[in-house]
Amino acid sequence: MGKIALQLKATLENVTNLRPVGEDFRWYLKMKCGNCGEISEKWQYIRLMDSVALKGGRGSASMVQKCKLCARENSIEILSSTIKSYNAEDNEKFKTIVEFECRGLEPVDFQPQAGFAAEGVESGTVFSDINLQEKDWTDYDEKTQESVGIFEVTHQFVKC
């Protein structure tokens, strides 16, 4: 199946360097089995800090699971070197923020939640634990006395 990139698009107001924080950041995804096409009903998360051994000593992955429909063992790995921030210059454009190595599992939906951080464009003020589940986030930058926000968060998956 190969590599699949998650691209983010958002409108940033007075913030930049929007990024997931830490190896325990949870990427909430819905997955599709590459063998039978079954799509998971529930959100599943994968984290950089998780590593599961593959059968037959073929390495490890962030998630290994058996398809409920066809019983095939599939896996997906977060490629840590591909995690990028979304910056002010990326405003309202799709940008790859992470890539996944997919072996039988294909991500078909993404739900951003808590665990993001960003910085004030002018002030450098750090805003941590940003939750994007509602696709919008607002706050106030005391240093510049301006409102800050992230709006209209959307995503897409593209094959690399």
From Swiss-Prot:
Q: Which InterPro entries match?
A: CXXC_Zn-binding_euk (IPR008584)
Keywords, alphabetical: Metal-binding, Phosphoprotein, Zinc
Which residues are recorded as binding Zn(2+)? Answer: 33, 36, 67, 70
The record's PANTHER family line, in alphabetical order, gives: CXXC MOTIF CONTAINING ZINC BINDING PROTEIN (PTHR12857:SF0)
Q: What's this protein's name?
A: CXXC motif containing zinc binding protein
Free-text comment about domains: The N-terminal and the C-terminal half of the protein have a very similar 3D-structure, suggesting they arose from duplication. Requires a bound zinc ion for normal folding and solubility.
A Pfam family name for this chain?
A: CXXC_Zn-b_euk
Which ranges form a coiled coil? none
What is a GO molecular function of this protein?
Answer: zinc ion binding
On the tree of life, the source organism's domain of life is Eukaryota
Report the family membership. Answer: Belongs to the UPF0587 family.
User: Phosphoserine (modified residue): where?
Assistant: 75
State whether it acts alone or in a complex, and with which partners, per the record. Answer: Monomer.
